[in-house]
């Protein structure tokens, strides 16, 4: 649709009086008087009157995507051998009490708002850190100030492997001041439920150091799985290996080094 506006012209006598005789013929305006507006002018007016949409629109949640992400994480954890299932914080403390610093395991969280908890032996004893899940990603629980700096991962095994590699690189670094490991708050699950257990120090943060997983005896890893771990540590892309399809599929089922 083309919009037209009437240009300036002198008023006729009948128009000055505001009356028009019935016998008066219809007036034909000269061509220059009727000037079409450019097509973009109307669009610009509409654009100016329409409020701009905010850039940070809420993300639409996809339950199917969440289900697939959580199912994949459970599959990886069962293959790992260091997923301990539904043990409590006290049981995890007993298992890790005599282990060297940096020994860790993953278990189900006792908090209804979390799926998993990372239990690790630190300089202050066994410590539990909850693992958050949001927007199809997992991250370590932390306070509000440091949360934007905490990395997110598509599954729990990728999360743990990242921090193990980070701690290993810091240990091997020749620099006098290696990059610090993430400082995380003491969650409520660390409060000892047994009065006989010693209470943790009143510090508010603990430096996380992950070195080696604590494999469950009932989930002893097979020789095939151990060979798969070695291949994953030595080869960046298993698709480049001249392997039978069945063996290549087995390697892809657990593409991790832990």
Swiss-Prot record:
Tissue note? Expressed in various epithelial tissues. Abundantly expressed in liver and kidney, and to a lesser extent in lung. The tissue distribution of isoforms 1 and 1B is distinct.
Q: Which SMART domains match?
A: SH2, SOCS, SOCS_box
Modification comment: Association with EPOR may target the protein for proteolysis by the ubiquitin-dependent proteasome pathway. CIS is mainly monubiquitinated (37 kDa form) but may also exist in a polyubiquitinated form (45 kDa).
PROSITE patterns, per the entry: SH2, SOCS
Q: Name one GO molecular function term.
A: cytokine receptor binding
Induction (record text): By a subset of cytokines including EPO/erythropoietin.
Under the heading Gene3D superfamilies, the entry gives:
SH2 domain, SOCS box
Keyword Nucleus on entry: no
Provide the assembly information: Stably associated with the tyrosine-phosphorylated IL3 receptor beta chain and tyrosine-phosphorylated EPO receptor (EPOR).
Could you identify this protein by its name?
Answer: Cytokine-inducible SH2-containing protein
Which species does this protein come from? Homo sapiens
